[in-house]
Amino acid sequence: MIEQWQRGFVLHRREYRETSLLVDFFTEQHGRITLLAKGAKRVRSPLKAVLQPFTPLLLRWSGKGDLKVLTKAEPAALTLPMHHTALYSGLYVNEILIRVLENQTAYTALFQHYLQCITQLATQPEKLQVTLRTFEFHLLKALGYGVNFSICAATGQPIDAGMYYQFSENKGFFASLLRNHYTFCGKDLLAFEKGDFSDTDTLQAAKRFTRIALRPYLGSQPLKSRELFQAILPHKLKSS
């Protein structure tokens, strides 16, 4: 049994038999973990209203097998208010975490970045694009995606802000005269290195890069959150 309270968030939940739920959590010390919430669907269950996305939780669970049982869950703070585009962006973040994180592997630093990300989505929705790109770069780092944005992979020389570079997966950036989906301006790469997405062109380039970089982790299956976003807010999708 986990004796100490563990901080965590609901990433996703699904029905299990008649009265229970299987809940995917992102926890500070144990990373992503799936727990059985017995009786959580019952009307009088104290878990029914608590197990919601974007609610900071304190958790306890028990069990020795692969599927452990949630024994207690209490809100540590109020649910972060997500609306419209911010809500679907938050669901997107939750979905990619479910898809890419190893089960029961600690990502302590990433947990803090996740907390910062959803807080900013809730409180600063006008900065949504910057918030998402910043989190995606932190996620890639947590996954061990080691790309040097400041050095040319072919020469070992510093990236030139005025030149263009072709991205080669698992190798890095090479000076190139080509202009295609895998080509990036040096000034944008240097901004990536600093985590500076204040420039509009850099922000768009960052979105392009993270989609390329996350593709091997996410696989070919479409993101359900993006499909939902397309169906409900198609006119806003291009800016997210």
Curated annotation (Swiss-Prot):
NCBIfam families hit by this protein: reco
Keywords, comma-separated and alphabetical: DNA damage, DNA recombination, DNA repair
A GO cellular component entry from the record: bacterial nucleoid
Lineage: superkingdom: Bacteria
Protein name per the record: DNA repair protein RecO
Coiled-coil zones: none
The UniProt record lists the keyword DNA damage: yes
Recorded family membership: Belongs to the RecO family.
One Pfam family here: RecO_C
Signal peptide (from-to): none
Gene: recO
GO BP annotations listed: DNA recombination; double-strand break repair
Function: Involved in DNA repair and RecF pathway recombination.
Phylogenetic lineage: Bacteria, Pseudomonadati, Pseudomonadota, Gammaproteobacteria, Pasteurellales
